Amino acid sequence: TRNHSGIFDVSHMGQLFIYGGDELIKDLEKIFPLDLKNLKLNHSKYSFLMDKDAGIQDDLIITKINEGFLIILNAACKDNDFKILKELLKEKYKMVLDENRSLIAIQGPKSSQILNDVIDGVKDLNFMSGNWFLFDNQKVYITRSGYTGEDGFEISIPNNFADKLTRELIDKGSKLVGLGARDTLRLEAGLCLYGHDLDKDKTPVEANLKWAI
């Protein structure tokens, strides 16, 4: 992953789609410490779901899409996050914690070249931005992001097509990598892990993450 590219199956993470417009933006700004009104379409931000004392319930990535927002949640927290957000938003919006989509990450200095050979145009994405692309006539949402400290991409793809995509990436020279190695990579990069470096007893300020507020 440091020298070439590695593929990680991170489908255990939550993919939460919340559908809505300007009213949704106002409501989410009451929940997340972000300026979502000025977040550009198809751009992403790192943020937190916090309790009333600013304790971190989860850290997450929120992306503005045409339909509303796509929020990537930690696996151990996703069901509780969904419940909390449903209550806070008073069930005003359609919310889907999508179990029908896999999440495949390809990371490393060769990831852009390899993924672009399979899905044309992804190399033009900037860091922390994304868009819808087609793979085998299926809509996939790809962001230029990751959890390794390397250049890379995360691909939200229908479950039935995740295996085919992975095999094509392997055919182009990438290799499968386990989540234990991913944890080592994020440690080397100084990235936080919820449940270890972050928890509900810490605020973002106490966790030295003021830059994300």
Annotated model-derived regions:
Residues 1-213:
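Basic, glycine/lysine-rich polyanion-binding surfaces/domains
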